[in-house]
Amino acid sequence: MKSAIFITARTKSTRLPKKVLLEIKGKTIIEHLIERLKMAKLPDLIVLCTSTNPNDDVLVEIAKKNGIECFRGNEDDVLDRFEKAADFFNLDFIVVTWGDEPFCDPEYIDKMIDFYKETNADYINCEGLPAGTFTYGLKVDALKRACEIKAETDTEIWGGYFTESGMFDVRTLKVEDEIIKNSNITLTIDYPEDFELVKEIFNRLYKGKVFPLKEIIKLLKENPELQEINKNCQELYEANIKRLTKVKFKKPTKVK
């Protein structure tokens, strides 16, 4: 079984332009993410999945500089990009991350791969981690089926193809560690205030190497004023996700 981490990233962004290239402590957001993802032990490789748009050439250079693979595909059809990348690298299972989430937890990437080995699930979500730290797992065979049934070419938000069709074995990896279990914290970067919070976390915790998620949670619990920085963004984030999660299928689907 061959697995990989896919980093979904483009420089195109409406709410916070070129956010993956914003710098903290001398590194871009996406480079901090790559550094963290390298801590995962089970994936066979890390692939930066970006678009063929010339504006994303800079991301190709970042991948080369940081010693990871890169694949370029359709700018808007993310599922198509995933499928072609999975074929190119001959993968069986992928763990999906986003380039604007520098705190993605490598421990739960390994847990997700182990969970897949136990269940052979088509689609795995992670329940309990803060927004911006969890991932999704996809069996490549299921990804190919999803690409066959989708009726849209813009699949930036794609989870519904797996969860709403009734065609896939959907499983949930639940977080049992009470220290990091916290779904009320938002650590993704969608708005300027999000970036200010992330920057403050790095300023306090980053000493030249990756710091664990537990330290981030501890910092935020001990300093509740930090969560006030992007408090208003959480509702915007949730509303935007709900707006984008509707998906269209080519034909009616049936539960197996």
Segments (PLM) and residue ranges:
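Short beta-strand-to-loop acidic/aromatic patch adjacent to the donor-nucleotide binding site
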Residues: L91-E101
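N-terminal nucleotide-binding beta1-loop-alpha1 segment
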Residues: M1-L16
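Conserved alpha/beta core of the MobA/IspD/sugar-nucleotide pyrophosphorylase nucleotidyltransferase superfamily
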Residues: Y161-K256
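Short beta-strand-to-loop element that shapes/binds the nucleotide-sugar donor at the catalytic cleft/hinge
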Residues: Y123-D141
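Conserved donor-nucleotide/metal-binding helix-loop-beta segment in metal-dependent transferases, i.e.
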Residues: K84, D105-L129
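Anionic-ligand binding region
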Residues: T133, D141-G166, T172
